[in-house]
Amino acid sequence: MTQNTFKVALATKNGAYFLTPDEGRKKWEKSKPFLTEENINKVVSDGHGNFFAASLTEGVFRSIDGGKSWKPANKGLHVRKVWEVAANPHEPGTIYAGTQYGHLFKSANSGDSWEEVVSLHDAPNRENWGIDWGFRTTGLALHTIRFDLNDPKKIYLVASGNGTYRSDDGGETWKSLKNGVNSACPLGEKGVSSAKPDSPPDEKRHKHLEEVHSCTHKIVVSPKDGRVYQQNHCGVYFSDNHGDQWKDVSINLENRFGFPVDVIEGDAPHVFVIPVPDPIYDCPDHNVCIQGQLSVYRTSDWGKSWSKLTNGLPGGVHTNVLRDSFAHDNSDHPGVYFGTTTGDAYFSDDLGESWKNIATGLGRIQGVNVVG
């Protein structure tokens, strides 16, 4: 991928935008908004000329002309609140969609039609799916689908409140991946651990924290070696055996909670997270709120140490960065991107050492992806 062959797609509550860089990624051109009547969670490309948009209002939309025009692509998709759409890199034309209520759909013809992956109904503990989220969150959503570039049979998925699952046979069977994940969120400290059952509201939150330890907010699979990285409701985890066992490498008790995670492979794996220290739940436009300094954290030594990266990022914010709102390109010098629920997009060309605002005033950004 060269610097002038991609665009950054920003999905928002009211449509989506493309940001196109110049050759040096010094200037960015913002497109007119598209799909403006839809609540868009994510825009992706399949590498073969097709773009797909996951809509929380009307299912999947497809473009076959580089995003200039869009049409619904929902035949067979019987749940239209779509959180995730992902192209299988091993099978051109094969697209997956994750929806509300924990359903997984597959298209073998680039979105012309869909069939439900019914094997997921037999996944371990499936009968207990359906955790009732409090604190203004989303309910049961199949929000993440990931592939292992080194193994065409491995597929990962995440359903909110129910942890990470993996298939080793292309989706025929599924395995729950919870070994090593804390049995409960840490309690009694700052951040997610600040709940104490001193009053009825706090008692409810205390119970909530004890139950959501298995809630994976996002995973990413290394394209180099298949290692898996997880941002959990209660911590950051690494796995070097495809999720069979997790290691807690959280920054500290104050910064365990967050939504996105990403990895850029180089001389070392550079892993990025954006914590929400001491999250504030009374902010419905943002799920929960980052208040104060907006900070990105990076580790390049498997979580032994973390660098706090704030150069170019604002302080005094009241915002959030959602699970799908962090991405990178595959240039020789990778660009890193993220968007906030207050409508700002940021870019770094030095692995997060410094940041530049490349878009503002877009409304609630829900997804950031590199397409092309």
Predicted features by range, described:
Residues M1-G372:
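Extracellular glycan-interacting surfaces
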